[in-house]
Design a protein with these regions (language model features):
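Short, threonine-centered small-residue motifs that mark membrane-proximal processing/anchoring sites
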Residues: 1-14, 18-25, 158-189, 195
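Mature extracellular "passenger" or substrate-interacting domains of secreted, surface-exposed proteins
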Residues: 23-168
Length: 195
């Protein structure tokens, strides 16, 4: 009987020891009381982000040698809107690392629809109709059918390097100002070309 317990303890220890931590989470930076809670298991970086404002939140990481063991590193987040304001869109921006193919998903809890979405090597974005007032999902933090985590590309990176993931829900006015600025630049360039 004693040997049986020792064998079970050894198997449990080996199981937990083989699950290397994905990357060291160095904390989050944000303004206005936004909170990040880490739920990382193995090589799957997973977070709950509780946003009380539209201020961006940046998650900071350091790679370890165990991160290059062959398991793909993935990212997911459940983003809760605690602000009472509708989130019209989301931008996820990477610094120091890139997304690997295939792209992951950005979905909602069903009270709003994803009206447009896209991604590049360092950014993923989505627009919501109507604005999300409850929560949305970057990747598959709850393991729901049809949702896919975002895979991070470790090619060319080394242990000790740092990277960050910034989640922002910008104000619609930000886009309006950007469009107005681009229109003004286009007008100035056209005028210069004509003159």
């Amino acid at each position: 009987m004693k040997l049986h317990h020792i064998a079970l303890a050894a198997i449990a220890a080996a199981t937990f020891a083989s699950q290397a931590q994905a990357a060291v989470f160095n904390g989050a930076t944000s303004a206005a009381g936004n909170v990040a809670t880490e739920f990382t298991i193995g090589s799957a970086l997973s977070f709950d982000l509780d946003l009380v404002s539209k201020a961006p939140i940046t998650l900071n990481f350091t790679l370890e040698s165990a991160d290059f063991s062959g398991d793909a590193m993935t990212f997911s987040a459940l983003v809760r809107n605690l602000s009472g304001l509708g989130f019209d869109n989301v931008n996820v921006t990477l610094s120091g690392i890139t997304f690997a193919a295939p792209a992951g998903t950005i979905t909602t809890d069903g009270f709003s629809a994803v009206s447009a979405y896209g991604s590049s090597a360092t950014q993923a974005w989505a627009s919501f109709t109507p604005g999300v007032s409850s929560e949305f999902y970057i990747g598959s933090p709850l393991g729901n059918a049809g949702e896919v985590n975002w895979t991070l590309n470790l090619d060319g990176l080394q242990a000790g390097q740092q990277f960050s993931v910034t989640v922002a829900v910008p104000e619609p006015e930000t886009y309006g100002l950007a469009v107005a600025g681009l229109a003004a630049l286009g007008f100035a360039a056209r005028r210069r070309k004509a003159g």
